[in-house]
């Protein structure tokens, strides 16, 4: 199944049923008076977060979703039947945005969470409501109200506690295979991973967190190179970043410069994102002679001016992986507990994530508009530099993001 993380849909809530004008007709009851019932209420449209879907691909092919119209009223003061509400299933981590106002209607981050996105119309009134002392036989009834019509954008961001970042072939997919049951494709060429992969890292009884393997970034990604920022937005909901650096690249490149590329791209794309807590992981230590390893790792850390936490691993053999798992679990648990115990800290965390998501959304849309303008100019014959931005409408990837237990 294709991984689709954006879709624009049109939703129409159900129209309300019409009220009717009718009169009581019963033997031995002359001038029975009005008995027209009201119309039913039109169905609302909701989105509901489900864990059995991980892509918005269905909304690429079915872009219009209408709730049913309610029934008209009936005689004998019987109201018409309201129409059923329409529920649109979306993956956990979906944000709903009104395309006309750019208002964020809500985020769905829990299984079963629902969000009202279009309200059904109220039913019309039957002629019973218009009876008065001067008008005992009203023939007036009102029509039902129309349901809301909206054009919305669904944006999917994977929900993970930890985001794996690094250049292509840094060992991210191998790492997530080591720590979870996720099985992303692994190969010795760049861009093996084309879509985010999620894995649940199980530490023990009731202790686990979710890790996301984000497709590799390259220099210029914030301006559209390679996979561009197409999937960088998926780290917007992570608590911290795990930055993997290949200390012995097969192409002979400098690991220090490779690490700086990622740090610079994060800063260019979103300063708020670059300020997330980061852990540096020096990977593939099994590829360096033991007598040279300590000197090389010390050199990399010093050249980067890194003052944060550093781990050394060999993801292929699993060396050093457990230490990272337990460190991450302890940090995440402390943060979760503090959010529960300290309302001020919880509010600050929420505000930070809201700022981050707003910044990511703004930057993503700005780059998409620049890409569209460049493509339009190219069609008109303007000489433009090559633009490799991967527009979401042209996504042909064939992999689905899957939660692995």
Swiss-Prot record:
SUPFAM superfamilies, sorted: Obg GTP-binding protein N-terminal domain, P-loop containing nucleoside triphosphate hydrolases
Protein residues bound to GTP: 166-173, 191-195, 213-216, 283-286, 314-316
InterPro entries: G_OBG, GTP-bd, GTP-bd_Obg/CgtA, GTP1-OBG_CS, GTP1_OBG_dom, GTP1_OBG_dom_sf, OBG_GTPase, P-loop_NTPase
Composition bias type Acidic residues, residue spans: 383-399
EC number: 3.6.5.-
Annotated GO CC locations: cytoplasm
Top-level taxon: Bacteria
Pfam family, one: GTP1_OBG
Residues where Mg(2+) binds: 173, 193
UniProt record similarity statement: Belongs to the TRAFAC class OBG-HflX-like GTPase superfamily. OBG GTPase family.
Subunit structure: Monomer.
Name assigned to this protein: GTPase Obg
